[in-house]
């Protein structure tokens, strides 16, 4: 009987540890100040990306909100066969920035950031800065999120 209870305790404890490691979206997704207050590392990543790519944090965060709703594990919904059988995803986009695999590979090659991870906010913020800076060089203003998008 004690062994049985110990198994459940270990399983429950492991589940709690895994859940605590998951990154949750911000509690107040409509307020960038509250997001940065809650997630200081996101603020630091946004400022770092701004210094490197000259893209303001509000533009960067608007991309993240639009693409993933601040979810690290965001992916496109699976297509359905016969309306209910899950099938393939329509694209390879993953993470905060919803970067496609090919575009992400281009970013890693151009920046030398070969260990970048699409589910890491810091890397996604840098990617968005890189991507938006491409739009700037095509004639769009760095502060115009709609045009850069």
Where are these regions (language model features)?
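Bacterial N-terminal signal peptides that target proteins for export
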Residues: 2-9
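Catalytic glycan-binding domains that act on GlcNAc-containing polysaccharides
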Residues: 22-149
């Amino acid at each position: 009987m004690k062994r049985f209870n110990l198994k459940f305790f270990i399983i429950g404890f492991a589940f709690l540890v895994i859940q605590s490691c998951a990154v949750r979206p911000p509690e107040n997704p409509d307020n960038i100040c509250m997001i940065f207050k809650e997630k200081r590392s996101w603020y630091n990543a946004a400022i770092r990306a701004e210094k490197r790519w000259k893209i303001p944090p509000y533009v960067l965060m608007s991309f993240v909100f639009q693409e993933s709703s601040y979810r690290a594990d965001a992916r496109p919904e699976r297509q359905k066969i016969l309306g209910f059988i899950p099938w393939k995803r329509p694209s390879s986009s993953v993470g905060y920035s919803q970067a496609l695999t090919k575009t992400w590979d281009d970013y890693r090659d151009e920046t030398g950031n070969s260990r970048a991870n699409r589910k890491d906010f810091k890397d996604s913020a840098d990617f968005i800065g890189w991507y938006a800076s491409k739009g700037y060089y095509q004639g769009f203003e760095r502060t115009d999120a709609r045009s850069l998008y």
